[in-house]
Amino acid sequence: MKNKIYKKIMITQGIKDIDQFKMEMYSILTSIVYDREIYKHNKELEELFLKLNIPCKPYLLKSRNQSIIKFLSVIHKSTYEELVEQLQILKKVMIESMEEDNKVETTEKTKESRL
């Protein structure tokens, strides 16, 4: 799933129409928030709020649905330039998450080879 989200981010970078860009951002953010491989616990979503410079009240972290509503309302109000900045942040989030997966896989392979 992470590879698909990353590919969608890369495709979205070339979109110039703000309405189309927003629709793609809705899709990307929803996929990231609901993917438990990226953020296993709701509390971890606070990190995403901070990276995107979105104010985060504690009640938002109790439910992924509430978090999504906040993210989507911010996207809806954003300018094209703000959306581009947010997309770059999401790209970094995905790269970090995929790199973490690679570290885990490498560690597991090393352990297996020692046995």
Where are these regions (language model features)?
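Basic helix-extension-helix modules of the SAP/HeH family
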Residues: 2-115
